[in-house]
Amino acid sequence: MKIIIDGDGCAGRDIIEEVGKKHSVKILIYCTINHMINSDYSEVRMVDGGFQSVDMYVANNTEENDIVITQDYGVAAMALGKGALAISPRGYIYDNDNIDRLLFERHLSQKNRRAGGKSKGNHKRNKEDDDRLYYNLEVLIEKVKAILN
């Protein structure tokens, strides 16, 4: 088990590292060369700045029972397809019961924007998001530990 972070624009990294350290789980952060990320605990892997480069590195380096942290539903879907677990930086768990709906909603939003419509953005990150991320990341780690033991 390892935690893989889609690092471009990933809030909550300090919480993820705190939980990872607590459970001695290796953390890999993938980010483009345009984002300078430093960490005393995680291994930071810089990739080229091409379109969806980070997404492809995350997907290609995800294995069964890994935990992927991403706000991208497509990356989450690829992780789930490989037998990994996935969670958003706000602590929402992606699973086979909700990923199809999320992908469809994303498709509808993109279609609406192309037609000139507007979509509302995410709310500002708050303590509730931090608490949800901490708690649900703990839940996923314990779930993987139970599978591996």
Curated annotation (Swiss-Prot):
It comes from the Bacteria. InterPro entries: UPF0178. Pfam families: DUF188. Belongs to the UPF0178 family. This is UPF0178 protein CPE2266. It comes from Clostridium perfringens (strain 13 / Type A).
